[in-house]
Amino acid sequence: MSKQNKKDWKKFKDEHKEEHKVENEILEEETDEESQHQEPALGHPSYTALEEQLTLAEQKAHENWEKSVRALAELENVRRRMEREVANAHKYGVEKLISALLPVVDSLEQALQLADKNSDPSMHEGLELTMKLFLDALQKFDVEQIDPLGQTFDPQQHEAMSMQPAPGAPPNSVITVFQKGYKLSDRVIRPARVIVSTK
């Protein structure tokens, strides 16, 4: 590069340096002016009013969000409760009907106990078949007979009518069944009425 070119280059750089310096000063002045204009705007009454409105709107939005969360939780609880009630209605819907039929089963059992096998064997056989059909029909609806003779007393399924000493029987065991119990699925419809042995 010739000396003349170097001088020209230096001159060009210096001129541009001055231009950049002037541009930077102008930008700084504009920034200062903007900040001077902004400072009074923050204290302006309309700005304060807008800030209060924004705060109130944020509070209202938060309240509405909390309400919606609570409403969704309540809706979920109602849905679960309804599902449980529908399932129970399907499972235990026949409970009233079965409770109404239990006295018929009791009457058939008493008739079988009182019928003399020697007097009329066909009648005894007919009662046995009727009883079997009845119990089979109940089993189709998940009804189970509770006949606890010889078992340990269970207050969840048995109702103790009295307690008696019973030689040879373990204590707290069922020695006599007055009336058999019934349960539908896992729910006891009627507890078995029993006499329990003492020590």
UniProtKB/Swiss-Prot annotation:
GO terms for molecular function: adenyl-nucleotide exchange factor activity; protein homodimerization activity; protein-folding chaperone binding; unfolded protein binding. GO terms for cellular component: cytosol. It is found in: Cytoplasm. Its main location: cytoplasm. Coiled coil: none annotated. Keywords: Chaperone, Cytoplasm, Stress response. Disulfide bonds: none annotated. Pfam families: GrpE. Participates actively in the response to hyperosmotic and heat shock by preventing the aggregation of stress-denatured proteins, in association with DnaK and GrpE. It is the nucleotide exchange factor for DnaK and may function as a thermosensor. Unfolded proteins bind initially to DnaJ; upon interaction with the DnaJ-bound protein, DnaK hydrolyzes its bound ATP, resulting in the formation of a stable complex. GrpE releases ADP from DnaK; ATP binding to DnaK triggers the release of the substrate protein, thus completing the reaction cycle. Belongs to the GrpE family. This is Protein GrpE. It comes from Legionella pneumophila.
